[in-house]
Regions:
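N-terminal segments that cap or nucleate solenoid repeat domains
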Residues: 2-49
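Structural signature of tandem-repeat unit edges
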Residues: 17-26, 43-57, 67-80, 90-103, ...
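Short acidic, gly/pro-rich beta-turn/loop elements at beta-sheet edges
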Residues: 30-32, 59, 128
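Intrinsically disordered, low-complexity boundary segments flanking structured domains
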Residues: 34-39, 83, 125-127
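Amphipathic alpha-helical interaction surfaces in cytosolic regulatory modules
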Residues: 38-41, 57, 61
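Consensus positions within tandem repeat domains that build extended binding/scaffold surfaces
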Residues: 59-62, 82-87, 105-110
């Protein structure tokens, strides 16, 4: 894979028709304010995020402020959702978190004000302020 579409050791990204697909093997990069995700400049064009199951983590602040994002599909196999991963995704209404996810870090879905409910594994570890107070969290047996 070309270096310009890398977003982790062995993890790549592709953006087409509003769908951002994360594929490959391993953990995504944890992005920061000073080193944002490579698609940050196009954040307002992303409507769907697909994370394939061979990717083990969703990187910190990876999809921060993707304000057009409505649908997130995380495939079974992903284990971690890092801090602030979807912070400020104000249009997000459909979120699929597989039972393989065992840890969701601080503020991962902070500011996702359109989200109403989510289902996670019953022993999933949650840090502080993962979801807005308005989100109904349901638990399923892992």
């Amino acid at each position: 894979a070309a270096a310009n579409n890398s977003c982790g050791e062995g993890v790549t990204w592709a953006l087409a028709d509003g769908t951002l697909t994360i594929s490959g093997t391993g953990r995504m990069t944890n992005f920061t304010k000073d080193a944002p995700a490579p698609w940050a400049a196009q954040a307002d064009q992303i409507t769907t995020v697909e994370v394939e199951g061979t990717v083990t983590s969703v990187g910190a602040t990876a999809f921060k402020d993707c304000t057009a994002l409505t649908t997130v599909n995380i495939a079974d196999g992903v284990e971690y959702i890092e801090a602030g991963a979807f912070n400020g995704c104000t249009a997000l209404t459909e979120l699929n978190i597989p039972l393989s996810v065992g840890y969701i870090k601080t503020g991962a879905f902070k500011g996702c004000t359109a989200l109403t409910s989510v289902t996670i594994r019953d022993d999933c570890r949650l840090d502080m302020n993962v979801f807005p107070d308005t989100v109904e969290v349901n638990y399923a047996e892992g």
